Design a protein with these regions (language model features):
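Short, flexible helix-loop junctions that flank or precede catalytic/ligand sites
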Residues: 1-173
Length: 173
């Protein structure tokens, strides 16, 4: 499959763990080439059914956006972008998703609506319509998550909001 799947939440909300679980599941069930761009690499993935290339920003590559521009020459099926930090990185991720790849990414936002708005507002206002259109075509889902303290015992529990785009949601974007 292709498109863009985002896992969002504040620092320490388990975004990296969720993405590592998704990558591991795909690695067990699918075959293909997975490329991860991370800062830093938090989970090391071994090859199962997929060939996995993990790159660390700062040591293996200069930036997320620069890595994304060069990445298509390695013929990935799935791409994980550790963090969509700026318009250049977001645009590269959207373009890769548009060209038939499955792209996972994270943002530090607290809700699905805030995530959509953050992506659009990362660009100058004269590009908002173009970004909205592209996002509405490639978005496959957003998981906004937080770790919430348990009420009657120690520890935390995962709370999440999931947006799966329907035709109506795509039109609203």
């Amino acid at each position: 499959s292709n498109g863009l799947i985002l896992v969002t939440g504040p620092t320490g909300s388990g975004k990296s763990t969720t993405l590592a679980s998704l990558i591991d599941r795909l690695n067990e069930k699918e075959s293909g080439h997975i490329i991860t761009l991370e800062d830093p690499i938090e989970f090391v993935h071994s090859h199962k059914k997929c060939f996995i290339t993990q790159r660390e920003i700062g040591s293996d590559s200069i930036s997320f956006s620069r890595s994304l521009k060069a990445l298509l020459r390695q013929d990935p099926d799935i791409v994980l972008v550790g963090e969509l930090r700026d318009a250049e990185t977001i645009e590269a991720a959207l373009t890769i998703a548009e060209t038939g790849h499955l792209v996972f990414g994270t943002l530090h936002t607290n809700s699905c609506v805030q995530t959509v708005n953050r992506i659009i507002n990362a660009f100058p206002s004269d590009r908002h319509d173009q970004v909205r259109t592209l996002l509405s075509f490639v978005l496959q889902g957003i998981v906004a998550q937080q770790l919430i303290p348990k009420t009657f015992e120690s520890g935390r529990v995962l709370g999440m909001e999931i947006l799966l785009p329907t035709t109506a949601i795509r039109n609203l974007i």
